[in-house]
Amino acid sequence: MTLYHFVGIKGSGMSALAHILFDMGETVQGSDIEKEFFTEKSLREKGITILPFNQENIKEGMTIIAGNAFNDDHEEIVRAHELGLTVTRYHDFLGNFMSQYTSVAVTGSHGKTSTTGLLSHVMNGDKKTSYLIGDGTGMGMPGSEYFAFEACEYRRHFLSYSPDYAIITNIDFDHPDYFASMSDVFNAFQEMTKKVKKAIVACGDDENLRDIEADIPIYYYGFKEDNKVVAKNMKTTPQGTQFEVYIDGELFDTFVTPMYGDHQVLNALAVITICHLEGLDNAAVKHALSTFGGVKRRFSEKIQDEQILIDDYAHHPTEIKATLQSAHLKYPERKVIAIFQPHTFSRTSAFLEDFANSLKLADKVYLCDIFGSVREDSGELTIGDLQILIPGAELINESNVNLLKQYKDAVVIFMGAGDIQKIQVAYENLK
């Protein structure tokens, strides 16, 4: 039996893929840095071994799956090559894996993880669907007909995939350490559409997506009347958001999602469109949509005393704005307190003023030091450069989280793609 060894198993995509292979009966282990990540708990609960990086982890007969963050000079990858083992990059392995299913890629600059989670949940309401979500969640179901997966545009990794369908949520400038400009980002998505086999489902309210050209049908969804699939008559209730869906100008049905915010309705429209194209039972789709509980680190809520604590992955100005708007919609009577940790110096520099403007939607802002990525450990920029752009913003770390106690009955949101969770944990552990 093949033993799959994951180099960088704690990465969100890597851990999800490890779950999938394990669920399908494969033997799986992996290695990573010793720092704790939110993906670890579920891996360990399945009995999947997680080792610290060491070339001695690599043995004869293993198949190596390497995370995209680790170069060929990594000690374990070097050792694998010395032993003549097959080393496959995450995105290449995933590209080959999906060929056995009717596959749906979910991509876009924002909203990939939430939409993939929703898609997998809703499709499973009618058809067996295996899935890989960017929150570290994955499920390999024997006998699955469908495979729903998150496809990241970073470094054009999504060009390794040839899915049957693709959902594109939006196109926005991000990853300034790789993409040179907005046109560079657009060109990457344009390249990706050429790899899709059956159809593209895209947000027609996004002007950039209207410029996409494809040799297959593009089904546009959104709030504007010129889309094929349109959401109308939205109503916000304590239970979520209700909306009507029109297809080609005709009322299709009324749906309810437990989520809040325009972006959540757009995500739902994308999923409804895919299910409609594939002929899934609409009653099952409606029920599943109404029972969606969200995904990890995307508006993940818990109650502590009188406060609502929210953990969210938002790390781009567009995402921060959407998260804060959702909080105000769901809890209109409460103050919203934002604790934000910028992720990467390059992104912070590129979007400095945009970060400041989006964070101003909060009633109070606290900032953490910038979190550098594996590829970028330092920069000339400091968190003070962002702080001065936000009136009343203060700095916070694990030693002064008691500052948050003063906001009785508030919504306290911890946002970022780094290790912002350590701030929330420190706050929750206050005596």
Swiss-Prot record:
Subcellular location: Cytoplasm
GO-annotated cellular components: cytoplasm
Main subcellular location of this protein, as a coarse class: cytoplasm
UniProt-listed InterPro entries: Mur-like_cat_sf (IPR036565), Mur_ligase_C (IPR004101), Mur_ligase_C_dom_sf (IPR036615), Mur_ligase_cen (IPR013221), Mur_ligase_N (IPR000713), MurCDEF_pg_biosynth (IPR050061), UDP-N-AcMur_Ala_ligase_MurC (IPR005758)
Signal peptide boundaries: none
Pfam families: Mur_ligase (PF01225), Mur_ligase_C (PF02875), Mur_ligase_M (PF08245)
Catalyzed chemical reaction(s): UDP-N-acetyl-alpha-D-muramate + L-alanine + ATP = UDP-N-acetyl-alpha-D-muramoyl-L-alanine + ADP + phosphate + H(+)
Keywords carried by this UniProt record: ATP-binding, Cell cycle, Cell division, Cell shape, Cell wall biogenesis/degradation, Cytoplasm, Ligase, Nucleotide-binding, Peptidoglycan synthesis
E.C. numbers: 6.3.2.8
HAMAP family xrefs: MurC
Function: Cell wall formation.
Similarity annotation: Belongs to the MurCDEF family.
Stated name of the protein: UDP-N-acetylmuramate--L-alanine ligase
Organism of provenance: Macrococcus caseolyticus (strain JCSC5402) (Macrococcoides caseolyticum)
Biological classification of the source: Bacteria, Bacillati, Bacillota, Bacilli, Bacillales
